[in-house]
Amino acid sequence: LVGSEMCIRDSDKGWNYDCDVVSRFLLELGWSWLGYTSYLDMQVLNWMKDQSYIRKDRIVISGFSLGTEPMMVLGVLDKDIYAFVYNDFLCQTQERAVVMTKPDKENRRPFPNSIRHLIPGYWRYFNFPDVVASLAPRPIIFTEGGLDRDFRLVQSAYTASGKPENAEFHHYPKFADKAVRKDVEHLDEGLDSKTYFETVNVDPPSHYFKNELVIPWLRKVLK
């Protein structure tokens, strides 16, 4: 099980480690945070495949928070990966940037994410639900919801691949009841972060690794 977690590089420095500075230098060099972390994770993955005690046909990779991005990249690049754990909410990344534009107290329109999420040219071709959908029919579990609109897109890919049962979707407990969740096709512009998260069914204080969902799922898919 390869785990990709936010700021895992130099994690001995804890949350004081400034990932944004590293991201800036990587961008200046023609790289990106996503490109660098995906490259490093690929080295680990290739090493694992060389170990006699690891089943190469049952490798599962797990992404938590920012780590879901290199998880998606590894899945696209390496067809040997058996299954995926997506421990974050699923969103359309371009849409998030377009709608989270409410000016702050200094009348600036802040960018919705840190520079760590900046991937030059990415938005011209890709959206996160599209990339995840390309992983079909390999098993995947989503543990922290998002809009059912985006889950329907992923589910359609798994259905088309003949393995609809290989995609498992969970929402935050706060939004587990369908009657409580928002189910919209389009978001209004001018949202602040709090309103955006509420609209896409995200409960930030409950953002943690959902082992209570992942462990039973792993037992099922690794039989």
Task: Label the model's feature ranges.
Residues 12-52:
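Alpha/beta-hydrolase active-site loop
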Residues 1-8:
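Short, small-residue-biased leader/transition segments that mark boundaries at the very start
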Residues 68-79:
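Short glycine-enriched nucleophile-adjacent loop
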Residues 160-223:
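C-terminal catalytic histidine-bearing segment of alpha/beta-hydrolase fold enzymes
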Residues 20-29, 36, 82-132, 137, ...:
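Mobile cap/lid helix-loop segments that gate and shape the active-site cleft of serine hydrolases
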Residues 53-65:
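Alpha/beta-hydrolase fold nucleophile elbow
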Residues 143-152:
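Conserved alpha/beta-hydrolase "acid-adjacent" motif
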